[in-house]
Amino acid sequence: MKEFYLTVEQIGDSIFERYIDSNGRERTREVEYKPSLFAHCPESQATKYFDIYGKPCTRKLFANMRDASQWIKRMEDIGLEALGMDDFKLAYLSDTYNYEIKYDHTKIRVANFDIEVTSPDGFPEPSQAKHPIDAITHYDSIDDRFYVFDLLNSPYGNVEEWSIEIAAKLQEQGGDEVPSEIIDKIIYMPFDNEKELLMEYLNFWQQKTPVILTGWNVESFDIPYVYNRIKNIFGESTAKRLSPHRKTRVKVIENMYGSREIITLFGISVLDYIDLYKKFSFTNQPSYSLDYISEFELNVGKLKYDGPISKLRESNHQRYISYNIIDVYRVLQIDAKRQFINLSLDMGYYAKIQIQSVFSPIKTWDAIIFNSLKEQNKVIPQGRSHPVQPYPGAFVKEPIPNRYKYVMSFDLTSLYPSIIRQVNISPETIAGTFKVAPLHDYINAIAERPSDVYSCSPNGMMYYKDRDGVVPTEITKVFNQRKEHKGYMLAAQRNGEIIKEALHNPNLSVDEPLDVDYRFDFSDEIKEKIKKLSAKSLNEMLFRAQRTEVAGMTAQINRKLLINSLYGALGNVWFRYYDLRNATAITTFGQMALQWIERKVNEYLNEVCGTEGEAFVLYGDTDSIYVSADKIIDKVGESKFRDTNHWVDFLDKFARERMEPAIDRGFREMCEYMNNKQHLMFMDREAIAGPPLGSKGIGGFWTGKKRYALNVWDMEGTRYAEPKLKIMGLETQKSSTPKAVQKALKECIRRMLQEGEESLQEYFKEFEKEFRQLNYISIASVSSANNIAKYDVGGFPGPKCPFHIRGILTYNRAIKGNIDAPQVVEGEKVYVLPLREGNPFGDKCIAWPSGTEITDLIKDDVLHWMDYTVLLEKTFIKPLEGFTSAAKLDYEKKASLFDMFDF
C-alpha cells in the first residue's frame, strides 16, 4: 500500500505529520518543510510556470516556512503579488502526496468519547472544570472496544463498582438493557480517586492517540472539560499531553449566544458529531440533543433514569455508568447509519486537506483547485480580502394561492454549477462587459444579442470561449467523478440483488466466493457461477457487494456536496477566487434561465391546448418550474382514463416525449442568444401529482412563495404504489410546530389532497377532541432561546419581549435557587406552553429546555394551568386556516338552514 497522511500540523518552522506507512503502521515525522512561492516575471524570461491569466511566473524556493512568510509580507509592503499556496500545510500535503490517495479507514483510529461530571451547583462549566470527572467512556475503532473509566470515591459520595452482569439484564429484571452486541466489548476500570483515573486515562490516550476524535458536543464540552480538569490538577504541561505533539491552542469564541472555549489538540482532528449532523443531514430539528436525534434516527433514545442527572451517580451508580456507555454507543449507531465520518474522510483525502477542514467549502475548494493547477504548472493567485457587498439571489415566482388539481414539476440539474460551466465563468476568463438592457428584455428575447464573440450573462459580463476556465474545469472533473462513482454504486446494488436472489435457493457444491469486481454488472457467466455457490459464500459476496455499494455511495455523495458547495464558496469574500461580478453573473443568469423557460413552456402548451395567453407555469423557484396540467388532462378527457396509473402514465409520456424536448429546444435557443460556450441547461421531469382518479381530493395547493403541498404519484420515474406527500414550507415542516400537531396537519393535508373537504372536516372534529388528551411535550411549540438578556429586566419581561422569551423568564423565576432543574442555555431550543389567566407563575406562558421533561418542582402546576384553547388555536387551527383558505375548502362544516330538515 502507498503511504497516506492522518494529521498534519505546522508548529514553528516544522511540519509535524502522523501517517500510515507502506506496511500499514502508524508513524510520526517532523519535516523542515521548504515551501515554494511565485512572483511574476518578464515575458522574456524562460519559465514553465504561468498564473491563471497566462502571465509568466518565476518559482522561489525558501529554506523554511518563516522565510516564505516574511517574503509574502515584504511583497505586500511594496504592492506586489506573492503567488502560490500560502497555507503551508496544504502545500506540504500536495508535495508529499502527489498521487490519488487510497486510504484504508481500518487503519485510522477514531475515538468516540463521553464524560460525566456530577455538579451540585448547576451546569459544570468546562472553562472552569471545578468538579471531578467521575466517568469516561471511550470507544476505540481499531480495538473495537468501549473503555470505561469509573470514579468510585468522589467528594460527592462513594459508590460501588458497576456490574456488567446487571447492565446486560432487562429493565424488568433490574438491569440496564445494555445491548448484547457491545457487552463483550466493554473493558471496565474502577478508580479510587480522580487523580488515578485522569492519569490512567492520559496514559491510555497516549498509547491509543486518536486520529479522529468525535462524540456529541465534544468540542464545546467534553474536550475543554477534560483539558481544563487535567490542567487544574496536574498543570498545563500535563494537559498538553493530550496532543501527540504536546501543542495545544485555547480560543474563546464569542457569538450572540455568549462565549465558549475551544481547545485545539494539535495532531488530532476533531469531528464533533453534532456539527457533522447539522452539516450533512439536511434536516432541521426542533432539538439537537443526543436523545432527540437518537429517537429520530434510531427510534430509540438515551438510557432513561429517574430524577436529575446531578443526583443519578449517588442514587443509581449502576445506571449512571450504563447511561454513559449508551451515550457513546448511540453516536456510533447514528454514524453506522449515516456514515458521516467516512464521508468526511473521503472528502478530506480527495481534497488533500486536514480532515477537520471538511466543514469549510472555502478551504476544501482552495485545495482542490490548487492541486489541479499545480499539475499543469499553473500558479494560484494570492488570496485577498474583499468588502462584503450584496448581490442578486435566485428568482422565485409569486404563485396565485389556490388549489391545483394536476401538476408536473421540472428541475434543472445542478443549476449554478451548470451555469458556471455553460457561460465559462472564472476569474481569468473575464473578457469585458456589454451595455445591459433590463432583465425582462433578455427573458423575452427582445434585447439585442449581447455578443457574437464572447459568452455572456445578462448582468453585462462577457467571458472568453476559446479557453477553459479554472473553475468550470474543476466542476466538470467532479461532475464526471460523481457520475463514475454513482455508476459503481448502482452496479454494486444490482449485483447485490442478484446475490440475494441466489440466497433463496443456495447450492452446496462450491464453498468459495468468486473473486469479482463488484463495481461493474455481473456477466452472464458470473451469474451462472453464483447459482452454484453455498449460502456461506453468497453471504460473503453480498457483504462485499454492499461494502462496494456504500463506498460508491459515499464517494458520489461527497462529489455532489462538493459541486453544490462551490457556488457558496465563489460568493464568499474570503475565497481566493471571489469576484462580485462573477457571483452576480451566476445568479442573474439563473433568474433569466427560469423565466425564459417559463415563457417557452407557456408558449408551447398554449399551442398544444389551443389556448391563448394561458399561464400554465403556476410557480417557479430557483431551478424548478411547476406546470398546471389540468387543461392537458381536460383536452384528453378525464373520463378516458381507466384508473390513476393510467393518467400518471399519460403525463409521464407527455412530459418525456413532448415537454422535455420542447424545454431542451428552448434552452438551446437561450444558449445561442447568450452565445454561451456550451449548452448545459438540462431540465428533467421531477414530480407528477394529482388526486386519485374519481376521488374528491384536490391534488395540490399553494399558499404563497415556498409554501405548497402536492400528492405525488411519480418522482423522477420512480412510481409509488401509494402516493407520497411533497410538502414545502408549511407548518408540518417547521421545527417550531409541536410534533403531534405536525402529524395532525400532515393528515389534514393528506385528506385535502386525496379525499376532499368532507374527509378533512371529519378528521378536524376528531383531532379537536383528541388534543386535550395528548402528552404535553408532544403539543408544546418549539423556539430558540435567543437574546434572553436583552429582554430580561430583573427577571421579568421588558418592552416588546417575544412570547417564548417571556416563557423562559417565567421558568427561570419558577426554578430560582434549584440547581437540579434543567437550565435554559442561550441559543438552544425550548418548549413553550401558554398558561391560563390566574396561574401561580404570574405570566402568559412558560418555556423550558427542549428534549427534557419539565422539572417535577413545577410540573403539576404547569399541567393544571396549560391553556389548551390558545395552544390549539395558535399551533393547529391558524395554520390549517391558511391551507384551507388557499385551497377554497372549509375545515369545519358550516351550519345551514337545510341542516334543520330531513329532506
Feature names for model-found ranges:
Residues 652, 656-903:
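C-terminal, non-catalytic extensions of nucleic-acid polymerases
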Residues 1-209, 323-326, 330-346, 359-396, ...:
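DnaQ-like (DEDDh/DEDDy) 3′-5′ exonuclease domain used for proofreading
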Residues 207-222, 226, 268-362:
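Acidic, Mg2+-coordinating catalytic module of metal-dependent nucleases/exonucleases
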Residues 149, 155-285, 323:
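Conserved DEDDh/DEDDy metal-dependent 3′-5′ exonuclease domain
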Residues 625-659:
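Catalytic palm subdomain of template-directed nucleic-acid polymerases
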Residues 182-188, 208-212, 313-319, 396-405, ...:
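Glycine- and acidic
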Residues 175-191, 261-263, 451-469, 512-558, ...:
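Intrinsically disordered, low-complexity acidic Ser/Thr-rich regulatory segments
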Residues 308-428, 432-434, 503-512, 518-520, ...:
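Common nucleic-acid-contacting/processivity interface regions adjacent to the catalytic cores
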